[in-house]
Design a protein with these regions (language model features):
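Conserved alpha/beta-hydrolase catalytic His-Asp/Glu region
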Residues: 140-194
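Post-His helix in hydrolase/transferase enzymes
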Residues: 258-273
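Active-site loop/oxyanion-hole signature of alpha/beta-hydrolase fold enzymes
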Residues: 43-84
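Conserved serine/cysteine hydrolase catalytic core
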Residues: 165, 175-241, 249, 258
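Conserved HGGG/HGGXW glycine-rich cap/lid loop of the alpha/beta-hydrolase fold
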Residues: 7-55
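A catalytic-pocket lid/entrance helix-loop region that shapes and gates access to the active site
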Residues: 110-144
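Short beta-to-alpha linker loops that shape the active-site pocket of alpha/beta-hydrolase fold enzymes
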Residues: 46-50, 113, 253-254
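Conserved hydrolase catalytic core segment
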Residues: 79-123
Length: 276
């Protein structure tokens, strides 16, 4: 029996879709997408070390997460399903497709799943902070009230002018503990371990090269702090690593709003309809 906490959106008899969230995210990241795909059964687990799965031991990388998801799909008896992964979830989705091709019919990678450019001169122990910066620092902070944590996100550069009810619910779900010692659910240990798999590990490069199913990638042109360039500023110029991968830029979004707002989620939904 799977140990992961799982949220499902949509009808139980809908066409199944496995949705894999990012490195400090949770199953609540898919609320906007679910509205755009009302006929689909969106299966959205909290990965170990995040959300309501935070008490599980941290993963040992993307392939560990993939094994968790394979166990979940086997338990649900879904057969092969399309898988959408956002940010780190894209890496997990690639690992799942490589390990269990019988469970994955197609991939959609949302600003993730392609190796990140390794910062020059950065040691393995510092990789998480080099990529996530203030995001990683957020995990060690405490918040006196739920409203204080909402205010953190309201002021975040990524959400300027984009705050909505989904984001409020997303922020609320992310908190654990009791006031005045509320903290984000994602554990620092989980982030540190998983960050090592984001820079072109041998297994990841082999998994991409071996993909035989559709694997489009949607790129956000702006990053975690709404800065130009995003996580993949030079992606169009980088060599293709997967024979079935196409790259499409999604206009006017950043790494968060490509999924967590209605305009971005609508484009993600359109891409899912193509591969389902």
């Amino acid at each position: 029996m799977t140990l992961l906490h799982v949220t499902e959106y949509g009808p139980r008899d809908g066409a199944p879709l496995l949705a894999v969230h990012g490195i400090t995210s949770s199953s609540r990241a898919w609320a906007a997408l679910a509205r755009h795909l009302p006929d689909m059964r969106i299966i959205a687990p909290d990965l170990r070390g995040r959300g309501r799965s935070r008490a599980l031991p941290p993963s040992t990388g993307m392939r560990h997460h993939a094994a968790d998801l394979a166990e979940l799909l086997e338990e649900l008896g879904t057969g092969a399903v399309p898988v959408v992964g956002h940010s780190m979830g894209g890496f997990v989705a690639v690992a799942l497709a490589a390990a269990r091709p019988d469970l994955v019919s197609a991939l959609l990678l949302v600003d993730g799943g392609y190796p990140l450019a390794r910062p020059a001169g950065v040691a393995d122990a510092d990789l998480a902070d080099a990529v996530l910066g203030p995001v990683a620092q957020r995990l060690s902070q405490e918040y006196p009230t739920v409203e204080a944590y909402r205010d953190f996100w309201r002021r975040h550069p990524a959400f300027a002018g984009a705050w909505n009810a989904d984001l409020e619910a997303y922020a609320d779900y992310d908190l654990v503990g009791e006031p005045p010692h509320l903290r984000p659910a994602s554990t620092v240990e989980a982030i540190a371990e998983d960050s090592l798999d984001l820079y072109g590990s041998d297994w990841h490069l082999a998994a991409l090269a071996g993909l035989g199913i559709p694997a489009p990638l949607l790129r956000a042109p702006r990053g975690l702090l709404d800065e130009p360039g995003g996580l993949y500023p030079d992606l169009p110029a980088r060599p293709p690593l997967a024979p079935t991968m196409t790259v499409t830029d999604v206009p006017d979004v950043n790494h968060y709003t490509i999924l967590l707002t209605d305009p971005g989620a609508g484009i993600v939904a359109d891409a899912i309809r193509v591969i389902r």
